[in-house]
Amino acid sequence: MSVQAYTNTPNLPNLIHSESITNSPVFIPNLRSKSDNKHRLNTSEELPFTKKRRATKHFLKMEVSAKISEPPSSKSVEFGRHLNMRHDFSELLEQPLTTSKTRVFKSFNEKLKGKPQLVKSDKGVLPLNKQSDILNSYERVLSNASVDSALDKKAEVDIIPFDKSVMEPKNITFNDKSGLTKFGNSNSYETTYSDSSNYHTSTDSSQYNDQDDHVYDDTNDGTDDDINNNEYKDDESSSGSESYERDEDVDEEEEEDDDENNDEGDDEDENENDELRSENGSPNPSAAVINEQENMNMSGIEEYDETNLLNELGRIRRGNQFQSLASSILSSGNLENSDDEDVSLGPQTYRFNSSFHPFRSAFSAPGVQFGRLLEGIKDFSDPTVQMLSLQELSEAFAMSTEDMLVGLFSTDSYIAAFSEILSGRNYDFGEVSIQLMLSCTTCVSNMMEALPLCMAKIAYSPIVRILCERMFDMQYIDIAEQALGVLERLSKDFGICILEHRGMLAALQYFDFFYTTVQRTAISLAANCCKFLDESNASAAEEIIPLLSNILQSSDTIVVSKAYSCLETIIESLKTSPNIIETIISEDLITTIVNALTNSTSQNKSMHLQVQLLHIISSLCQSSSALILPFLNHNLPDVMYEMLCGIPPSDTSHQADMITMQSLYYCPIELIENLLRAITSLLPKNTSNLSDEFNTKLYRLNSILLTVVMDIYFIVPLHDIRSLAVTTALKMLCSIRENNLDGLVCSLPLSSFIASILNSRKSDNFLKRDALEMCLFLLEALPNVYSSLFIREGVVQEVGFLVRSTNADMKKIKLSISFSQNKSAARHEELKNLSTLKSLAKEFLSNYKEENLENSTLVQLKQLSKHLLSETKQDESFSELAKIFQEGSNITSHELLHSGLIHNLLLSLKKFGSSSLRTFLLAMNTCDEREVLEFGNGPLVSLIFCLQNLLSTVENFQLSTLPPDTENAVDHVFSRQFKLRLMALPGSRIRPPFRSLVVSINGLATIRTLDNYLHSRISVRNETGRRFSILREAGSLRESMSGSSRNSSGDYTDSMSQDAPNHTTEPSERRDSSTSSHFEEHFVFSLMGKKVPRNKTIFRILYEYIQLSDDHTLDDFWKTPVPIFYGEPDCIHNDMKGELNYENETEGFSINIREILDLLSILYYGIRDVHTLFPDKHFRGNIENILTDFSNWKLSAKLNRQLEEQQLVVHGCLPSWCISLTSAYPFLVPFETRYLLLQSTAFGLSRSVSFLLSRNPELSKNESSSILQFVSLHRQKIRISRKKIFNYALHLLATYAASENILEIEYEDEVGSGLGPTLEFYTSVSKEFTLNSLDIWRNDQPNSKFVYQASGLFPSPIPLLGSSPENERKISLFFALGQFVARSIYDSRIISIQFNPLFFARNIPLTISSVAKVDKGLANSLRYLEKLIPGKNPTNAETDIKLEDLHLDFTLPGFPSIELIPDGASTPVTTFNVSDYLNYVIDYTVGKGVQQQLEAFQNGFSSVFPYTSLQVLTEHELVTLFGTVDEDWSYATLMKSIVADHGYTMESPTIQRLLTLMSQMNFQEQRDFLQFITGSRKLPIGGFAGLNPPLTVVRRLNEPPYVPDDYLPSVMTCVNYLKLPEYSSSEVLGSRLSKAILEGQGSFHLS
C-alpha cells in the first residue's frame, strides 16, 4: 500500500469540487525557525477561529491516499492496483494530528486483514506493529524541515504487507523525488527481523544535518516526542511513544488552556488511541539503511511524479474519494481575516486575507501551471497536447472552488481558446476533433461550476453562438447533449444571449432524438429562456410554439409540466401584445389545452396541472378576446362544470342539479379560485357587437355555471373566494343578451341569492355593493319580473335596512374624524365606500313607492296561518294549504318566513298529536282513490322544497378554520410544539423553582398529561402533611430538559413530548376516574379565569382561547408562551368555578331556524312511518324518494367542508352545530357524511389520528412523522377455544371491552391469526347472542335453535313485580351485548344481528303503533280490543261481542308468567278495565317491560365509547349497519369490484365462470361464501367495493401428476384472497367451491 501524505504545500494542486466545501476551522502547525524558536502564534487574538486552540494544531492538513499491494514473491514482484483507498482526514479539522492516527490505521488494518506490516519511508523499512508509526515517520520529515520546505513538502510512506516466507531482510532504498531539501547527507539503518511478531531494530546512525530546528508539538497525545541534537533515539523502555525534546520555553499554562478547549471529539479520539496503544504496546520504530541505488522496486509501488498527479487525483475523484481534501481546502478559507492582520510564522510573514490562500500557489507549481495548460490548449499543431491539457484543466476545475481560483488567472484567454476549439476552424471534423470539442465543452461546464462569475463572460462570448450552431447541425448528438447542459446553466441568468442565437429552437427542434433526461434539460432551457421574452424577440416564441404543441403530447409528466410552464411564461411575457398572442396561439394548441384539462379531470391527475392549465386559459383570454370563442367552441364550460361537480352537466330537472351540487365540497379551494378566474376571463368586456354564435356560447356558459358560482358563495367559507363568486356572478349576468336573460334567470333563485348577501352578517360593503349592482341590472333588464319579486323575496326591505344602518355608520365615522387629530386616510376611504353604497341603495329604492309594497300572497298566508290553530277548521285549513303548495307554487322564502305559517303549522301538529298529522297527510294526498296514499310531485313535496330553500337562506352556521396566517399542513400542525408558561395560583404551596415554569408541549397532549408531568416533577406538601405522589407513567412522557436552565425572565424551561398518549374524548374520563385513586390529588388548571377540563388537548384549549380573544393567533403560541395557572384544588376561587368552553349549543339556531327544523322533522318521521299511521291504506310510490328530499345539500356541503379541516377534527374543535344538528336532525345530511363524522369524533384521539392517517396515507409513509407517535393503537391478541366460544366472549368483553387496543382473536390448536379469525369470531358470537335458549328476545318460532323475528330482534319483557336472578342474567347479557356491538364499531368489525329499529329509538311512544313495529299480530288484537271500549268506537256500540267471552286476564299475551298487576292471572279483563289492560300491555311490550334491558345495552355500549355518539345515525341506519343485508351481487358489480391477479385476468375463463356462479347464488349461499372468503357473513358498508383489501382471485398451481380438478380452492381471509385452481368447467368449479366452503367452516389451517 502506498500512502502519500500531502501537507498544505504550494506544490499540491487544489483539485476540489465546490460542492464538497464545508466551513470548518483549520489546523496550523507550530512552525518555527531556529531564529524565532521562542515565539508562538497568538491565535486567540490574530486569527478568527471558532475555538481557542494552539497554533500547533491549526495549519497542518494532510490527506492520505493508500494503495494496498501484495507482498513481493518470486511469481509477482510488482502488483499494486488492487485497491485504491483515501482516508478521510477531515477529523483533523477538529482534533490534533496524532489523535487521528488511530482512525487512519483502523481503515488500513481492515483492508490488510491484520497481516504484519512493514513501513517503507524516507527513513528506510520499518515494522508497522504500532498504529502511529507511519504518521511519526512523516512527522519526523516535517520536524526537520524549514518553514519554507515544510510548506512545499510531499511526504511518501509505503506500507508493505509482510510475508516472511518470501521477503528477505535486506536494505531498502528510498529515493526522494520530491525535489525538496535532503535531510542529512547519510542515514544508515541496519534492520533485522526475527520470527517473533515483535520486530527489533538497532540503530547504527541517526545523525541529521539540518540548519533549522523545528519542533512539532502535540499537546493532546499525552506523550513527549523528543528530538535532541537532531538525533533519532530508539528508547524501548519509553512509555509508549517516540519522544522529542521539548522546547524549554513552552508555556505550561498555555498547554493547559489548549487542553481545556478541546472538544468532545478529541477526548473520544484520545480514548480510542489509548485503547489501541494498550493493545499493540509501545511503538518500536526501526532503522533502515538508505541506499539510493535501489528505489522502491521491491514493494511494487508506483511513484508519483508531477506530470501524472492530476490524472491520478482525477481517478480518485471519479471514485468519489476526495471529500477529505475538500474539507481541507475549505478550512483554509477560514484563514481570511477581514482586518487583514499579519500573522508571524517564524522569520517570514504571511498576510491572511482574500489575496492569500495556502493552496493557491499550487497552481503555479512546476508542471501544473495554468499558463502551461493555456499554451497546450492553443497548440493546434498537436491535438494530443490539446486533449491532455483540456483533460487536466477540466479535472482542475472539477476539484476546485471559486475561492481557490479567483485571481490566479484571467478567464478571457481561456474563453477565447475554448471558442476557437469549438468553432472547428483549425481542423477537419473527425474523431480527434470531436473528442476535443467534447473535452472542451466539459471544461467550459466545469469552469462555470468552479467560477460562477465567469458565466457572464461566457454568455456574451462566441461560445453561446457556436454551441447553438452545433445543436442546429446535430451531426454529433454527444456534442449537442453537452451543449444543452452548458446552455441550460447559462439560461437561468443569461437567457437573452441564447435567445439572440435562436437557442430555444435549437434545443427543441430535435427533441425526440434525445433521451428523457436530456429532454428535460432541453425543455428546462426553453422554460428559462422564455422569462426573457418581450415584443422585440417574440419571433423566438413563435418559432417554438409548434414544437411545444408536440412536446405537450409526451408521456413524461415532468416534460409536459415544463412545456406548459414555457407556454405560461410566453403568454405572461407577451400578454400586453394581443396581436402577437393571436398570431402564435393556434387552434390546434387550444385543442391540446382543453383536451389536457379534460383528461386531467377524468383521470384525477395532479391539481397542479389543472391550476396551471386554468391559468394559461385565463391569461390567453384576458390578453385577447378573440381567443374566447375558440375555447367556448371546445366545450370548455362543460369541462369546468365537471371539474367543480365531478359529473358532466345535464339538462335534467333542477333537483338533479341540486344533487350534483353536493359534490362541490370535494373540490379544493385553490382549484375553485382558479376556476372562478377562468370563468371571468371567458366573459368579454364588450358584449354589444358579439356575433350570434358568440352569444349562444355565452348563454351556454351562463346556463351551466351561473348556478354553480352562486352555490360556491354558500359553500366556501373564505371571504376572498365568496367575494370573487359574487363578482363573477354579476359579470356573468351582464354578459347575457337581454332577449336571452329572461329564459335563463327565471329558473334561478337570483332574488333569494341577493337577499342572502344583504342579510348576511359576514357580508362586507363590497359584497353588498355587488349585490345592489345586480339588483339594478335586473330591474333595468327585467322590470316586470323583478320589481315584484324583490318585494316578495324581501330584498326591498333589506335594502331599506341597509340605508338606515349605513347612515348610522357614516355618522359615527364623521364624528370620529372630527374629534380625531389623526385624519386617517383609511377612515376617509371607508366613508367614501359607505357613501357609494348608500347611493346605490337609494337608487334602487327610488324604483319603489310605499303604496306599491303590498304583497297579496303574504296577506293570504297570514290569514291561513291563523286558522291552523283552530281544531274545528283544521281540515279546511289543510286543504287550502295544499292548494297553495300545488305543483308550480311560487311561494318565496321571505313570504313563508314572515307569514307565521311555519310557526302555527308546527304548533298545530304538536298540539293535536298524530291525529293532526294524519289529517295533514290526508290533505296532501294527490290520489283520488280512498284506500291509496300518494305524495309524489304534490303539495307535500312543494312544501318540503320551500322549507329547504328557506333553511338554506336563513341558516347562519359558521365554519371553523385555522387562522389564515397559520401553516395548514397536517403534519406541520401536529409536529409543532406550543409554549406554556405554567404559573402557580395565588396561595399555592408549590415550591419556588416551579412557580413559573415554561414548558414546550405538543398540541395533541392533554391537560391530564400535563398534570401527570407536573406530578413527576413537583412534590407538594398540603396542610395535613400529605405529599402529592411522584408518579412517572412509563412511556407516557419523555422529558428533554435544556439543563433545566433558567431563561432571561427567570423561568425554568422544559420540553415535553408524548410517546404514546392514551387519550380519547369521552373514554378518557372513565380511565381518568379509574386511575385517580393513584393520586392523592390532581392539579387544577385555569386560563382566562376559567377552569380547564382535563380531557381537552392543548391545541383545543388554545384554539378556544383564540376564539374568545381577538388579540391572539395560533402562531403566537408557537413563538411566545401562553400563561396557564395551576395549583391545588383548594386554590381555585369562587369566581373560577366555570370551565373554559367556547361551545355554544344554540350557536346558529335562531327561533326561525329551530321552527323550520322541527317542522321538517315531524314531516320526515310522519312520512317514514306512514304505514304505521295508515295501516289500512296502501302507499303508492317510493317513500325513499320523498325522504331524500329532506336532505339539505347546503348544510351537507358545509359539514363536509368542515370535516376537511382535519386538524380541528382530531382535536375536537368542530363547531357545536356539527354534532347537535346531525344528532337532532340526521335526515338533513347524507348517511356517508354522518358516518364519517362518527368515525372522526366518537372514538377518541388515538382512533381519530389513526383514521386521519388512513385518509392521508402520505402522512404515514414518513415513519419519522411526529404524528405517528400519537397513534398508540396496539393489537391485543387473545386465544380462545371454539368449544365454549360464547363463554370466552363474555369473559373477553368483561376484561377487554374498554381497552383501547385493537382486539384480535386466535383459536386454540389453529394456526390462523389476524383479520380472518377475528371476523369469524364476531360472526360466531353474533349468532350465539340469538340463541333461543338465552330467552332474551321475542320469538316467532319458539322451537327453533335460533331466534327468528320477522320485524327484527327486540327484547322480551321481564317481570316488573319483584326481582329475580333470571332478570339479572338477562340484564347482564344485554350489557355484554352492548359492549360487543360497540366493540364491533370501535374496531371496524362486521357483525350480523338483525335488530328491530325500535331497539335504537330514542323515545318510544307508548302507542299501539309502537307495538305494531314489534309484533303486528299483538297490535291487531289490541286495536280490536280498543274498538270494544265503550264510547271509543260508536259504530260498534251495538255489537254482540263481549269482552267477558274472550276470557282475558291481566297477564301479558305470549308471556303467561308475567302478571301485569298483582294477582293478574286471576283478574279478568272487562269493559270497565279493558282500557287499563291495553295500557299495561303496551307498557310491558315497548315500555317499562323492556326498559331495563335497553338501558343495560346502552350502558354496556357506553363502557366502550358514548352511546350518544350514535345519535348522528337513525335507528334504521343502525339496523342496516349491524345486520340488515341489502347487497348487490350482480355480474356488473362483481366485475367492477373483484381483482384478478397472479395468473388470472378478468377475461380468464375461470374468472368469468366464478363471477357467473356468484351472481346466481341464493341468499344462504351468499352468506356461506362470504364467511368462507372474509370470515364475516355480510359485506361492509359499500358492498364489494367496501372490502379492504378488495376481493382478489389468484391462480392456484397444480403439481404433477395432479390436475387442477383434483384441488380445492383455499383462502386467506386476512387479505380477502381466493386461491382458485383453473378448473375445467363451471360444474367442477361449483362443486369444488361448495365442498371447500362446507369443509372449511369453523377452522383456520394451512392449505
UniProtKB/Swiss-Prot annotation:
Gene3D superfamilies: Hect, E3 ligase catalytic domain, Hect, E3 ligase catalytic domains, Leucine-rich Repeat Variant. The keyword Transferase applies. One of its GO terms (molecular function) is ubiquitin protein ligase activity. The active site is at residue 1614. Residues 192-288, 1039-1076 are annotated as: Disordered. Residues 1294-1647 form the HECT domain. SUPFAM superfamilies: ARM repeat, Hect, E3 ligase catalytic domain. Residues 218-228, 245-273 have a biased composition (Acidic residues). Residues 1039-1050 have a biased composition (Low complexity). The keyword RNA-binding does not apply. Residues 192-209, 1051-1065 have a biased composition (Polar residues). It catalyses: S-ubiquitinyl-[E2 ubiquitin-conjugating enzyme]-L-cysteine + [acceptor protein]-L-lysine = [E2 ubiquitin-conjugating enzyme]-L-cysteine + N(6)-ubiquitinyl-[acceptor protein]-L-lysine. Signal peptide: none annotated. Belongs to the UPL family. K-HECT subfamily. PANTHER family: E3 UBIQUITIN-PROTEIN LIGASE HECTD1, E3 UBIQUITIN-PROTEIN LIGASE TRIP12. A cysteine residue is required for ubiquitin-thioester formation. E3 ubiquitin-protein ligase which accepts ubiquitin from an E2 ubiquitin-conjugating enzyme in the form of a thioester and then directly transfers the ubiquitin to targeted substrates. This is Probable ubiquitin fusion degradation protein C12B10.01c.
